[in-house]
């Protein structure tokens, strides 16, 4: 259900703006998107897991805030990120 360390490292390497970058909005959104996708798969089998659903809603809200920030700062990076992650907006 959670992301493996290898997958997280791959996401960081793919979306980092500079070497060793783990805090940029792109990296944070990519990691949150991976966690959200894992949880949506979890809910296909466990429909009544409302405790995890609350965590999912928190993650979606956090991702939305980061995307709004990125759109305000640099719209080019924002549009590139949502197309590469397949997020609709």
From Swiss-Prot:
<comment type="similarity">
    <text>Belongs to the universal ribosomal protein uS15 family.</text>
</comment>
<keyword id="KW-0689">Ribosomal protein</keyword>
<dbReference type="InterPro" id="IPR009068">
    <property type="entry name" value="uS15_NS1_RNA-bd_sf"/>
</dbReference>
<comment type="function">
    <text>One of the primary rRNA binding proteins, it binds directly to 16S rRNA where it helps nucleate assembly of the platform of the 30S subunit by binding and bridging several RNA helices of the 16S rRNA.</text>
</comment>
<dbReference type="GO" id="GO:0003735">
    <property type="term" value="F:structural constituent of ribosome"/>
</dbReference>
<dbReference type="Pfam" id="PF00312">
    <property type="entry name" value="Ribosomal_S15"/>
</dbReference>
<keyword id="KW-0694">RNA-binding</keyword>
<comment type="function">
    <text>Forms an intersubunit bridge (bridge B4) with the 23S rRNA of the 50S subunit in the ribosome.</text>
</comment>
<dbReference type="GO" id="GO:0019843">
    <property type="term" value="F:rRNA binding"/>
</dbReference>
<protein>
    <recommendedName>
        <fullName>Small ribosomal subunit protein uS15</fullName>
    </recommendedName>
</protein>
<keyword id="KW-0687">Ribonucleoprotein</keyword>
<keyword id="KW-0699">rRNA-binding</keyword>
<dbReference type="InterPro" id="IPR005290">
    <property type="entry name" value="Ribosomal_uS15_bac-type"/>
</dbReference>
<dbReference type="InterPro" id="IPR000589">
    <property type="entry name" value="Ribosomal_uS15"/>
</dbReference>
<dbReference type="GO" id="GO:0022627">
    <property type="term" value="C:cytosolic small ribosomal subunit"/>
</dbReference>
<comment type="subunit">
    <text>Part of the 30S ribosomal subunit. Forms a bridge to the 50S subunit in the 70S ribosome, contacting the 23S rRNA.</text>
</comment>
<dbReference type="GO" id="GO:0006412">
    <property type="term" value="P:translation"/>
</dbReference>
